[in-house]
Amino acid sequence: MRTRRDVPADRSGRSRVSRHPGLSVPSRTLEPVQELHDAPLAPLTTFRLGGPATRLLTATTDAEVIAAVREADDTGTPLLLIGGGSNLVIGDKGFDGTALHIATRGFRLDGTTLELAAGEIWTDAVARTVEAGLAGVECLAGIPGSAGATPIQNVGAYGQEVSATITEVTAYDRRSGETVALSNADCAFSYRHSRFKAEPERYVVLRVRFELENADGLSAPLRYAETARALGVEAGDRVPLTAARETVLRLRAGKGMVLDPEDHDTWSAGSFFTNPILTDEEFAAFRSRVAGRLGAAVEPPAFPAGEGRVKTSAAWLIDKAGFTKGYGTGPARISTKHTLALTNRGEATTEDLLALAREVVAGVHEAFGVTLVNEPVTVGVAL
């Protein structure tokens, strides 16, 4: 990790924000694009759930983002960062502090190097890379949210993860008061995890840099069997970029994983639970539970996840534990298209959603001895 520039200390001994070309950072003040008080947060999330924030700021430049963060840190005000809102579960009581909506924009392509501002809409950016003939993120089409969230979660789907193409993340380090550049190794990526997720109070992502591939209009080799089957090719083959993107969008839409305000199956955070990663011993015990419940002929999904570790399918677990598509009678239910998505049918509260999530977690654990972990970040509530 490196800072953009050596930063002298101010009279208090605290380092000032590092300034790099094109970034002018006000020391203490912010002129927000928008400032609201007792502001509803539900419209900023894909669940459309959650109570109000004491104060809501919207920032459209890196300088505004940094100044807002510094102001909150200097005054000891709790701070909630919101990008696309696709990975947030906010409590019904809301957030007692400042919510900062990061709405920065920026798409810069230099050869095969792509740099995105944190607030750039992710699925739009993917579409533009495909139009430019560059491979590496085409199977991540349709994922809701902003570019700045992708390294935090190490976003992945249909055989691709952003950790494979991210080369650098520019972030504001709240501990040092500097703008820093983190390499891929610095980010400490793992399955749906990163340094940013491990230290959520430290880094504010400002920009993300990717190294893509010019493969003469072809995709990266397909790594996901479902995508390959849908395209009529073998895993490992390349296909036209547009075909790969359109196929993924079609597959996602069929599971309610492409945002549509008229479709309550998309009023969700996409996959609500991560796929469990088990040790070999845990997986052996799990297989025994499966055999006892479903019969010796049934083999649970198993994917290598590093030495001595196996990943299995959360969606399979949920379904086999008896939680089928559309499960639930209240305003929060499992999607009618995909068992891994919990949805707001229009009148739900966050507590309704959490009650359903807890029921699923308890049911899966009782059936198979595996504990599901939520993928979305919870604010003011816990599973």
From Swiss-Prot:
Gene3D superfamilies in alphabetical order:
3.30.465.10, UDP-N-acetylenolpyruvoylglucosamine reductase, C-terminal domain, Uridine Diphospho-n-acetylenolpyruvylglucosamine Reductase, domain 2
* The entry's keywords: Cell cycle, Cell division, Cell shape, Cell wall biogenesis/degradation, Cytoplasm, FAD, Flavoprotein, NADP, Oxidoreductase, Peptidoglycan synthesis
Q: Name one GO molecular function term.
A: flavin adenine dinucleotide binding
Fetch the SUPFAM superfamilies from UniProt. FAD-binding/transporter-associated domain-like, Uridine diphospho-N-Acetylenolpyruvylglucosamine reductase, MurB, C-terminal domain
Reactions accelerated catalytically: UDP-N-acetyl-alpha-D-muramate + NADP(+) = UDP-N-acetyl-3-O-(1-carboxyvinyl)-alpha-D-glucosamine + NADPH + H(+)
- Which cellular component appears as one GO term in the record? cytosol
Where it sits in the cell: the answer is: Cytoplasm
Supply the EC number(s): 1.3.1.98
Q: Which cofactors, if any, are listed as required?
A: FAD
Active site positions, chain numbering: 192, 271, 375
Pathway assignment reads:
Cell wall biogenesis; peptidoglycan biosynthesis
Q: What class of enzyme is it?
A: oxidoreductase
Q: Which InterPro entries match?
A: FAD-bd_PCMH, FAD-bd_PCMH-like_sf, FAD-bd_PCMH_sub1, FAD-bd_PCMH_sub2, MurB, MurB_C, MurB_C_sf, Oxid_FAD_bind_N
Instruction: List compositional bias (Basic and acidic residues) regions by residue number.
Output: 1-13
The record's Gene Ontology biological-process terms are: cell division; cell wall organization; peptidoglycan biosynthetic process; regulation of cell shape
Where does the FAD-binding PCMH-type domain lie?
49-215
Return the similarity comment: Belongs to the MurB family.
**Biological role:** Cell wall formation.
The molecule here is called UDP-N-acetylenolpyruvoylglucosamine reductase
Q: Which organism is it from?
A: Streptomyces coelicolor (strain ATCC BAA-471 / A3(2) / M145)
